[in-house]
Amino acid sequence: MALLYPNTYPLAVSNLGFQLLYRLLNDSEEIVCERFVYPQEREPFRSLESSRPLVDFPLIFGSISFEQDYAHLAAMLVAGGVAPYAADRPGKIAAGSPLVVLGGVGVFMNPEPLALFADLMVIGEAEPVLPRLLPALAALTDRRELTEIGATIPGCYVPSAYSFRYDSDGRVREISVSEGLPQQVRRVALEQSDLAAHSEILSPEAELGMYMTELGRGCSRGCRFCAAGFIYRPPRLWSADAVLDGLGQRPPEVDRVGLLGMEMADPELLDSIAGFLQVFCRPMPVRSLFPHCGQTEFPLAYLNSSLILA
């Protein structure tokens, strides 16, 4: 299968969600996943792993993080020889007429702007959905069978099975749904993680040039200007074991660590992280970056240590 990131390689390899999805897909026995990124000028549009064209793949996943990348997604499908609109693809799923599955923050924040391009959309976080979705997709031969997935797997939205009627001012008046499908597709969220998401691929082209580890998802503050604080509900902080296990995957030659989260971890976890880095990252001193601390109280001792680069 092909995994698309509709922006350049430096942004793709810096995106922790894209890296996590790449690992989850390749961990599956049903899937061999190859990446595509939006090509820069005069770059060939081929998979990064084997240099195959997009049209060779019968299954395409797209990870959409930003609204500015919507046009890039359509351009990538056209450049790869794939009909951009789902309605223009034949019913039978095959190379040249692939099944297009879209997910990511941009999708579950508002799926409708991209619904015309997608045969299937994942509304929510990938980890709870993929264990059931991937075997179902592997057995799929025709797009008409997608309604069974939409009816049985939470978080799976089949746009072609829903039709909308609008008022004159553009508001939705009525939604008609195919038989057996839910009236509303509820967003799904991971309850707890045994292993915090972390960098799977390290590249000198990545932004900030660091090994990233996720502290949790969501934020309890609910600032009205922040979409992420609302779409990643409920707010969750990963356990110390999950975060330290994620940090433990760091290659020994990497000296820059990023701890990512919309809400800072509690002091006990920060103490554990600081102790872990001091013990397991010698003799090379590790520099850590907390890009967003909100208004969380931050102990002065961390700022006085060699562990923090703010």
Question: Where do the PLM segments sit?
Answer:
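Short helix-loop-beta junction
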Residues: 20-32, 279-281
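Glycine-rich beta-alpha loop elements in corrinoid/cobalamin-binding modules
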Residues: 38-177
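A short beta-strand-loop structural module common to alpha/beta enzyme folds
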Residues: 29-41
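Conserved SAM/AdoMet-binding glycine-rich loop
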Residues: 3-4, 8, 244-310
